From Swiss-Prot:
GO biological process: amino acid biosynthetic process; aromatic amino acid family biosynthetic process; chorismate biosynthetic process
Keyword annotations of the record: Amino-acid biosynthesis, Aromatic amino acid biosynthesis, ATP-binding, Cytoplasm, Kinase, Magnesium, Metal-binding, Nucleotide-binding, Transferase
Coarse class of the protein's main subcellular location: cytoplasm
Protein residues bound to ATP: G11, T12, G13, K14, S15, A16, R117
Cofactor(s) this protein cannot do without: Mg(2+)
UniProt pathway annotation: Metabolic intermediate biosynthesis; chorismate biosynthesis; chorismate from D-erythrose 4-phosphate and phosphoenolpyruvate: step 5/7
Similarity comment text for this entry: Belongs to the shikimate kinase family.
Residue intervals passing through the bilayer: none
UniProt-listed SUPFAM superfamilies: P-loop containing nucleoside triphosphate hydrolases (SSF52540)
Taxonomic placement: Bacteria, Bacillati, Bacillota, Clostridia, Thermoanaerobacterales
UniProt organism field: Desulforudis audaxviator (strain MP104C)
Name of this chain's protein: Shikimate kinase
EC numbers for this chain: 2.7.1.71
């Protein structure tokens, strides 16, 4: 069973939508940033400060290679995962890419008080617009995109469910049996 991979800019709701979608589909949920934090033993913000963005992106790429195999997961990715074409190819090999988007002002309202966003320093509103401009078109790799600023969480999940059903991504009797996140294979760096 293919993974359902949520992509989009920070603050578009990937984790919230992913968690809800996983519960409805009775599939394991994996947040790539949380998994990288678990493996590194420190928060993303500290990885960026102490080890640099290059190290974080390297860990992210390694995780994407592990996700190239369909495992029936719902995966919330970090906002910059699509900047590496190899990540996109690996994620697409194992699943269907669903995009989440929102207006810059909606994103600002969602992330402005969060201290855990390493790419948001200084004028947060301006930085969001700058990053969105830099990433213009990067999220177009999604097969289907929902504007989470225009829809409630339940409506967003419902629209994704409709798309998955229409495209045949939801197979009868393919729900996760264990309910936990399957062990990802160890891939040599």
């Amino acid at each position: 069973m293919r993974n359902v991979i949520l992509i989009g800019f920070m603050g578009t709701g990937k984790s919230a939508v992913g968690w809800r979608l996983a519960r409805i589909l009775d599939r394991p949920f994996l947040d790539t940033d949380s998994e990288i934090e678990r493996l590194a033993g420190k928060p993303v913000r500290r990885i960026f400060i102490e080890d640099g963005e290059v190290r974080f992106r390297s860990e992210e790429a390694l995780l994407c290679r592990k996700l190239a195999v369909p495992r029936g997961l719902v995966v919330a990715t970090g906002g910059g995962v699509v900047l590496n074409p190899e990540n996109v190819a690996n994620l697409r090999a194992g699943g269907v890419l669903i995009g989440l988007s929102a207006d810059p002002e909606v994103i600002y309202q969602r992330v402005r008080r969060k201290k855990s966003r390493p790419l948001l320093r200084g004028n947060v509103r301006a930085r969001i617009r700058e990053l969105l401009e830099e990433r213009a078109g990067a999220y177009d790799v999604a097969e289907f995109t929902v504007d989470t600023g225009m829809h409630s969480l339940p409506k967003t999940v419902g629209l994704i469910m409709e798309f998955l059903k229409e495209r045949g991504y939801l197979e009868a009797g393919s729900d996760s049996e264990s309910g936990g996140v399957p062990e990802l294979p160890d891939i040599s760096r």
